[in-house]
Amino acid sequence: MDYKETLLMPQTEFPMRGNLPKREPEMQKKWEEMDIYRKVQERTKGRPLFVLHDGPPYANGDIHMGHALNKILKDIIVRYKSMSGFCAPYVPGWDTHGLPIETALTKQGVDRKSMSVAEFRKLCEQYAYEQIDNQRQQFKRLGVRGDWDNPYITLKPEYEAQQIKVFGEMAKKGLIYKGLKPVYWSPSSESALAEAEIEYKDKRSPSIYVAFPVKDGKGVLQGDERIVIWTTTPWTIPANLAIAVHPDLDYYIVEANGQKYVVAAALAESVAKEVGWEAWSVVKTVKGKELEYVVAKHPFYERDSLVVCGEHVTTDAGTGCVHTAPGHGEDDFIVGQKYGLPVLCPVDERGYMTEEAPGFAGMFYDEANKAITQKLEEVGALLKLSFITHSYPHDWRTKQPTIFRATTQWFASIDKIRDQLLDAIKETKWVPEWGEIRIHNMVRDRGDWCISRQRAWGVPIPVFYGENGEPIITDETIEHVSNLFRQYGSNVWFEREAKDLLPEGFTHPSSPNGLFTKETDIMDVWFDSGSSHQAVLVERDDLERPADLYLEGSDQYRGWFNSSLSTAVAVTGKAPYKGVLSHGFVLDGEGRKMSKSLGNVVVPAKVMEQLGADILRLWVASVDYQADVRISDNILKQVSEVYRKIRNTFRFMLGNLFDFDPNQNAVPVGELGELDRYMLAKLNKLIAKVKKAYDSYDFAAVYHEMNHFCTVELSAFYLDMAKDILYIEAADCRARRAVQTVLYETVVALAKLIAPILPHTADEVWEHIPNRKEQVESVQLTDMPEPMAIDGEEALLAKWDAFMDVRDDILKALENARNEKVIGKSLTASVTVYPKDEVRALLASINEDLRQLLIVSAFSVADESYDAAPAEAERLNHVAVIVRPAEGETCERCWTVTPDVGRDESHPTLCPRCAHIVNEHYSA
């Protein structure tokens, strides 16, 4: 007889290899056919709502690793929430206006000068939709579940209509104003930029020390002194109207090289060194406030430069006397307003000097640096020229330097709502906690928000002008424009005359003849996405404001978190979110930024093509995403190895359930043996830990707990030990059904617990669970497992955890014996232990077969104590152990070594247990 035929070996169609790149798209097709998103929403209808509001990615180009990290994190949360008592809709969105799309079209050869603004905007819209379709497919390939057929898009009419209402509401509260003000200006984009559109990069600039001759010393100075300033922007010298000093600082009048100079006392030493005064002496000391209203002379124009006082002056660098050009700096502008100085800005929108800078008109500002420095040298005002490399603001899109330039712009007042904003920040939960400090400081220190842009592709600023140039914004005009946009989209603004955009019969005191013009600037794109709390959360029936969570990269403290907060507090007085969670950036394996030049870019599409989305998702779960994270082929290899172990654990459990029906074969929990109950108690512990980790967005803990449970608790212990029962015993034997009961409960619970992270694999496992109690087609339509009721659970855990420590000792002794060639496999061993007293009682209380638990052929507890163990025994923590080769023959069926093999003459190669099973169940 072939005894192999009498073994109950595992059977399952669940494949050992994931082959995810091929299998995942098939699974996704199935989800689409069953309309899984709608099914989940229907099943969870009426539960408390949990809204994770999607920050919209920009609709341009393929998705990168940062997108993948972001969308997968969101998906894990949404999937978990919908399996734990919430209705968790997920509406993805796209940000679609702005310069990158204009630039992309220009690169494609579109000549925007040859068409109307409205025509150009139609091409922009078409391009945006193409990009959305491309990105949507890539996001879906990641396994992200959402309302992909009805996303929110910032260029959709209903979105724009709500955005106009946000603007109108802010205007009504006096928070929108038009003003001349220095703003970040990008000559390369020919537009104003918001702070969120600025990035700092190193730039080489000239560093000059310039002497301004004193014209009127106002009785404090004699009139033969020269005030020394320092600047790295010589091109702003033509716009100089003042010199700022700090009222409370001491200033020296210094004599050097036969001349007298004014510098801050604290900086005199460093200035002398820098400009090369070898012998210098202090003639007089004065306070900054004494110098107020002293008149100096512009170095090369016939014009005065007034000494003014400003709190912004520091002694960090320079001379303590600050060159002040109100048209080219925020502090300069503010101090200029205080002293009634004009706002002079002799630079045009392309960065070229104008006629207001005689002698330099027509020069690009950066080129003018040289000519102006030469002019200063000619007139004897230049004390020193050198070059420095410093961190300087650049346009985040064109990567070119920006300048400060005073222009007429539309602003949203931050100042008027600053206290409310800071209160709203306090009431929000920020994770990580440093996020709160970061956004608090940003809001505390930021200026008013410049919301106008001089571009074509964006939402128009809905303002009309009367015949006298007065801006008109009324409830009536806002309501009308909002309705027009809802009906026709914002292109209508560029297709119609002002009169056709106003309500029928509209009149206004500023236009006695009924003539109106319209604003041509558009809104900053951050105003677009920043209005989503109204344009999406309020607009849609399935969502609500405030959202439970905003989750984006840490660059969004100054971006979307900030603009959303500003508009929401302005309109509603409250934050648009209850909680904000931020993640770091994706770096390469060595912690470097990814760049084409370094050749270290990891592309999500490629990872999915080679390894699958579930591997990428498992990587996301494995990292500490609140800081910057690393990815490389090597890191993904390690993650794939963990995936393989988890998958193999599932496969083993599924394979050993092939003949198990939980409705008929399950053993009630109360009737299970201690070890089986212990495993269910361990499963209970896992369920509690994993759910707690999901609740606190600690996915790395989920990853580690699941990995540990599969490899240590299951594979290395219970499943290994259970083979002897599962394969060897008769099919319907009580011990075998007990183990299968544990496996069934475990496989169902693990499939659910891992489903938010590995949705494809979890559903594949789900399909292969034989005779499932829950007859639903996807694990996504179930809830997270609940712990089972187990009598005396804590005592059980304490007892068996203690046994596991003893087992570790014995395994160590077996390992040593194997290395010393005393035994081969552990089943060839006979083990004798000499326990410490408390361990003796523990071993005596165990009813299970200790041979089976330790996978050895003979096991005995010696009468002698630990201390009295013979010299040959290996002394370990809890027991002393002697390992010898087991005596007897090897049973052909179960591989146990015993002297009793062949006792049943009809089965000369079997042990009595196997002979009995074969006689009872397999004899013809």
UniProtKB/Swiss-Prot annotation:
**What EC class is this?**
ligase
Query: How is its cofactor bound, per UniProt?
Result: Binds 1 zinc ion per subunit.
Q: What Pfam families does this protein map onto? A: Anticodon_1, tRNA-synt_1, zf-FPG_IleRS
Q: Which cofactors must be present for this protein to function?
A: Zn(2+)
Q: Copy the domain comment.
A: IleRS has two distinct active sites: one for aminoacylation and one for editing. The misactivated valine is translocated from the active site to the editing site, which sterically excludes the correctly activated isoleucine. The single editing site contains two valyl binding pockets, one specific for each substrate (Val-AMP or Val-tRNA(Ile)).
Protein family? Belongs to the class-I aminoacyl-tRNA synthetase family. IleS type 1 subfamily.
HAMAP family named in the record: Ile_tRNA_synth_type1
Spell out the protein name for this chain: Isoleucine--tRNA ligase
This chain's source organism reads Geobacillus thermodenitrificans (strain NG80-2)
The opening ranks of the lineage are: Bacteria, Bacillati, Bacillota, Bacilli, Bacillales
Which gene is transcribed and translated to give this protein? ileS
